[in-house]
């Protein structure tokens, strides 16, 4: 994860170079400290910035596709409105979004569960010499397979047969080596 101060430096540098920056904060709700990582506080001061957020990941409603963006660049907003589908948000999505964001009990419990499980999983993976776990900031963990001769596909194939779904990261650019990624689930599912 990138801190707000580092994001500010990036946005400032891009502004000097006339570069528009879009930051995807789809997974920010899973972070331990949203204020330390979110670029939303920068939006009023930088017209070369747009922050994108979604609620479907955190609220486990992937089919809903409910998201929003924030920018202080009025010209960019007008261009978006010009090309926006007039029915981009249906009444069910709007209603669900309101309910989701008002459910503070769910938000609190989910954040606590993710925090606890994220720490537990990371600490457990640290004890396995054939794996290198990267400290997670969201609801998933990136793991490098250090066991020579074992590929990410081998691990994926083995786990899918056990009805465990992980992501084979072999198609991810910039990941040199064998990597997998998996989501943090319930304590019972994570223990499996």
Summary of predicted features, one role per range:
Residues 114-115, 128-162:
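Conserved PLP-binding catalytic core of the aspartate aminotransferase-like
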Residues 73, 147-149, 186-189:
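Helix N-cap motif at beta-to-alpha junctions
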Residues 63, 137, 174-176:
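Short acidic/glycine-enriched loop/turn segments that link adjacent beta-strands
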Residues 5, 12, 161-162, 171-192:
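PLP-dependent enzyme catalytic core of the Aspartate aminotransferase-like
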Residues 48-134:
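PLP-dependent aminotransferase class I/II
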Residues 2-21, 25-58:
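Active-site pre-lysine segment of PLP-dependent enzymes
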């Amino acid at each position: 994860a990138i801190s707000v101060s580092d994001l500010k430096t990036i946005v400032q540098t891009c502004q000097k170079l006339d570069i528009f920056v879009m930051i995807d904060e789809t997974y920010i709700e899973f972070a331990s400290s949203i204020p330390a990582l979110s670029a939303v506080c920068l939006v009023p001061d930088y017209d070369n910035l747009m922050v994108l957020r979604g609620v479907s990941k955190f609220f486990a409603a992937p089919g809903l596709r409910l998201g929003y963006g924030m920018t202080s660049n009025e010209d960019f907003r007008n261009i978006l409105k010009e090309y926006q589908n007039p029915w981009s948000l249906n009444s069910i999505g709007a209603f669900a979004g309101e309910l989701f964001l008002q459910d503070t009990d769910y938000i609190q419990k989910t954040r606590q569960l993710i925090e606890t499980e994220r720490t537990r999983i990371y600490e457990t993976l640290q004890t396995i010499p054939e794996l290198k776990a990267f400290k997670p900031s969201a609801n998933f963990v990136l793991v490098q397979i250090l066991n020579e001769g074992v590929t990410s596909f081998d691990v994926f194939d083995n786990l899918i047969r056990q009805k465990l779904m992980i992501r084979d990261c072999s198609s991810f650019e910039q990941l040199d080596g064998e990597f997998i990624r998996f989501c943090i689930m319930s304590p019972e599912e994570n223990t499996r």
